[in-house]
A protein has these predicted regions:
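Helix-loop junctions at membrane interfaces in 12-TM secondary transporters
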Residues: 7-9, 91-110, 303-315
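Cytoplasmic helix-loop-helix junction between adjacent transmembrane helices
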Residues: 112-147
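Symmetry-related core transmembrane helices of the 12-TM Major Facilitator Superfamily/SLC fold
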Residues: 169-186
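Helix-to-loop junctions at the C-terminal end of transmembrane segments
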Residues: 58-72, 161-162, 270-284
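Structural signature of the two symmetry-related core transmembrane helices
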Residues: 75-90, 286-301
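Helix-loop boundary and gating motifs at the non-cytosolic
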Residues: 2-57, 217-225, 229-248, 256-257
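Loop-to-transmembrane helix entry
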Residues: 40-51, 138-143, 171, 246-266, ...
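Juxtamembrane intracellular "pre-TM" segments in multi-pass secondary transporters
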Residues: 1-6, 187-222, 248-249
Length: 318
């Protein structure tokens, strides 16, 4: 393994780590925080998450087009990383006052801010690092492993922080955002790679973007995403509040849930080592079908069984 390979691999792995640390520590405990600290009911919390997803739909077409134009340039990634520094400020000092002033205003601002950083921004982060990994000759799936490790760490640490002070998880996210910015700055892309990209890449026009919308396969793929990933996200958003109701105290429920999430992402990290080989063997289409089946089993099992043990087992799936 060359010196450059080591530096790039761990640099971009570190970027994945701190990005998904923010993702995990936020979304694992946000449903509980919205209920207990922001004093929102289940319907209002659902609207918050729906707003974030809707904002992502607005961001994605533009982010994809802009990132294709930028190629290896880090401008858009830098905007997303910079915005993540303000998680602590936003949730502790801005979001709740906005909700108290006007719920819909708070919903609107939160949706576009959170989606910029996470639901909308994740595509930029993953596609950029995937592109860099190919140009530097290392396996993207192995770099993505750092994200799974971050999930396990964030879930465990987040549970401890949340029980001591719920607001502290957002300050932890801000610190991670600052480290992410430093790692992004320290990960320069070679000029020859940028020039090669300019030479080899075909010019992407607006007509090319609109032609995609006319493809039948594109809409079938979108339907698969809506039927699996979107439902998966809704399930994950509502599960924490549901899970803790089976415990004698909410503190015990939160503590167990954080450890369960840590165990899940640790298992995910191990599986990520073998995931690239599996997907290469069975193909992307069968990989998506497998994901859909596992998602169905996870959600259906959680709806049928009501014991803590069975709920924990189904939470570990997918």
């Amino acid at each position: 393994m060359s010196k450059v390979f080591k530096r790039d691999f761990f640099n971009y792995g570190g970027m994945f780590y701190f990005y998904f640390f923010i993702w995990a520590i936020t979304f694992a405990f946000l449903p509980i925080w919205l209920k207990d600290n922001a004093h929102l009911n289940e319907v209002q919390s659902g609207l918050i998450f729906s707003g974030i997803s809707l904002a992502a739909l607005c961001y994605h077409p533009f982010f994809g087009y802009i990132q294709d134009k930028l190629g290896y340039k880090k401008n858009l990634f830098a905007i997303i990383a910079g915005a993540m520094i303000f998680f602590g400020v936003f949730f502790n000092w801005i979001f709740i006052p906005l909700l108290e002033y006007n719920f819909w205003l708070g919903l609107f601002v939160c949706s576009f801010y959170m989606s910029l950083c996470l639901y909308g921004g994740v595509g930029v982060v993953e596609s950029y690092i995937e592109r860099v990994s190919r140009s530097n000759g290392f396996e993207y799936g192995h770099v993505r492993l750092f994200g799974s490790i971050a999930g396990a760490t964030a879930s465990f640490v987040g549970g401890i922080l949340f029980l001591q002070n719920p607001e502290s998880i957002f300050w932890a996210a801000s610190i991670s955002g600052a480290i992410l910015c430093v790692l992004l700055y320290l990960a320069p892309v070679k000029k020859d790679v940028i020039e090669k990209t300019k030479t080899n890449n075909a010019v992407i026009t607006k007509n090319d973007v609109f032609k995609i919308l006319k493809l039948k396969d594109f809409w079938f793929f979108a339907l698969i995403i809506v039927g699996t990933a979107a439902i998966y996200d809704v399930f994950d958003q509502q599960f924490p509040n549901y899970y803790v109701t089976f415990f004698d105290t909410k503190a015990n429920g939160i503590d167990t849930f954080s450890k369960l999430c840590a165990a899940q992402t640790a298992i995910e990290a191990i599986l990520m080592i073998f995931a690239p080989a599996l997907v290469n063997k069975i193909g992307a289409k069968k990989g998506l079908l497998l994901f859909g089946v596992l998602t169905f089993i996870r959600i259906a099992g959680s709806a049928i069984f009501t014991s803590i043990t069975m709920l924990s087992i189904f939470r570990l799936i997918a």
